[in-house]
Amino acid sequence: METNLQKRKDSRKALRIKVISMGNAEVGKSCIIKRYCEKRFVPKYQATIGIDYGVTKVHIKDREIKVNIFDMAGHPFFYEVRNEFYKDTQGVILVYDVGHKETFESLDGWLAEMKQELGPQGNIDNIVFAVCANKIDSTKHRSVDESEGRLWSESKGFLYFETSAQSGEGINEMFQAFYSAIVDLCDNGGKRPVSAINIGFTKEQADSIRRIRNCKDSWDMLGVKPGATRDEVNKAYRKLAVLLHPDKCMAPGSEDAFKAVVNARTALLKNIK
């Protein structure tokens, strides 16, 4: 006969979670799930019609986890179908195609859609997100580099992984870390532990790196107007250099941003008497 202690231990081990996939059509959401659950890759594209549902069992941290996976269609046509499935979610697999930048730029829109459907009582800060930079096997056509994807993800406290559903690269590692984080979430009363949210860099640093990445010229990069004086250029440079120096800034892409700022200053000072 089971004791109360044994029953409590068993109930602690058993866990049921809900996971959804999000991202544009054709980024490989279904292929990532099939690669992990069925150990296979389906080369021919088959559009998800509305929602695909599956159940799998995994063992994480000495716990049996029953995972209910809702693979959501990425086409806007299916919005009225997928909007019913956002609530009561513990984990989200957010996918983009590294070869098509528009799928990366759509990630903010997916988050906005989820926030809208969760309503004022919803809180995505208490959901585990795993961002998959997918199709890294197609490196010849890559338009979103790792530092850009990692910066976007980590600035929001999301997990980030480079994956290939075709080769399987990064898939198992992603799911293991993803499920482990969800177990921690559930054990912490449905809230992400503080240690999981600490990202190691500021919003100002992340915003500056993104701005520098998209600047068209050296004036814009330093944030000064054409015709600025030598002192104004140096002042703007010093501010950014302190903010982004790789020894002090842990944000992905900080080293490249710092080098770009140094080069911008050098280029401008050459033309200022």
Curated annotation (Swiss-Prot):
Keyword GTP-binding applies: yes
Binding site for GTP: 23-30, 71-75, 134-137
Keywords, in A-Z order: GTP-binding, Nucleotide-binding, Nucleus
One CC-aspect GO term: lysosome
InterPro entries: DnaJ_domain, J_dom_sf, P-loop_NTPase, Small_GTP-bd, Small_GTPase
CDD domains assigned to the protein according to its UniProt record, in alphabetical order: DnaJ (cd06257), RJL (cd04119)
Pfam family, one: DnaJ
Native species: Xenopus laevis (African clawed frog)
Database matches in PROSITE patterns: DNAJ_2, RAB
Role, per record: GTPase possibly involved in regulation of the MEK/ERK pathway.
Domain J positions: 217-273
Entry superkingdom: Eukaryota
Assigned protein family: Belongs to the small GTPase superfamily. Rab family.
GO biological process: phagosome-lysosome fusion; vesicle-mediated transport
Gene Ontology molecular function: GTP binding; GTPase activity
Record protein name field: DnaJ homolog subfamily C member 27-A
Localization of this protein: Nucleus
This protein's encoding gene: dnajc27-a
Signal peptide: none
